[in-house]
């Protein structure tokens, strides 16, 4: 259930994620991994609309599990923020550096070139891996939603703003752009569904 002004509400009709699914898989820490692969998903704010955020989500899987559909992903951080490119780029770089130079997963047709451009002047060693999709947000999210329903997506601790967006965004109805959700889908798709070329991962402890 969602809480709004102290009143508990049922799950939102049409929302892709249910709160009980997230809660059932929540953990306090990640398990020991043989070959952790960490990546940072980003959905950059490229518009001047007030309230638009840049989604920055970090997750890890055990790369020793070769079958991606058997992997479990652990969401480690939500560093999303509302800021102009010169600010969110610094936060994005700091997030990637904090996790051992973790690769950044970005959609090529939604600010991918901008991300590479702004990061070059901050830390040119950071790798930006582009992903491209011809489908809408809801279709892209489906494999990640399925993984969550299978109990394979674990939030390490609580990420209230991210979780609120996941459980309230309704395709074709919610007007606000789901920036955190998009970044979440980018990184979890790369780790659980289809890895972009060049994905090697960062480190959990940096």
Residue ranges and their predicted role:
Residues 29-33, 47-50, 94-98:
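Short, conserved, surface-exposed binding loops centered on an aromatic residue
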């Amino acid at each position: 259930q969602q809480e709004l002004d102290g009143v508990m509400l049922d799950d939102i009709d049409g929302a892709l994620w249910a709160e009980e699914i997230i809660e059932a898989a929540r953990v306090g820490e990640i398990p020991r991994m043989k070959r952790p692969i960490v990546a940072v998903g980003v959905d950059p704010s490229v518009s001047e609309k007030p309230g638009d955020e840049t989604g920055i989500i970090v997750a890890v899987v055990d790369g020793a599990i070769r079958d991606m559909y058997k992997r479990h992903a652990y969401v480690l951080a939500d560093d999303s923020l509302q800021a102009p490119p010169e600010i969110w780029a610094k936060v994005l770089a700091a997030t990637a550096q904090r996790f051992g130079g973790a690769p950044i997963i970005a959609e090529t047709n939604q600010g991918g070139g901008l991300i590479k451009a702004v990061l070059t002047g901050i830390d040119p060693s950071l790798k930006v891996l582009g992903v491209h999709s011809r489908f809408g947000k809801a279709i892209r999210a489906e494999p990640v939603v399925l993984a969550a329903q299978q109990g394979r997506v674990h939030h390490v601790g609580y990420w209230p703003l991210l979780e609120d967006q996941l459980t309230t965004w309704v395709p074709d109805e919610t007007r606000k752009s789901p920036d955190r959700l998009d970044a979440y889908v980018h990184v979890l798709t790369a780790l659980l569904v289809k890895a972009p070329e060049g994905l090697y991962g960062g480190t959990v402890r940096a």
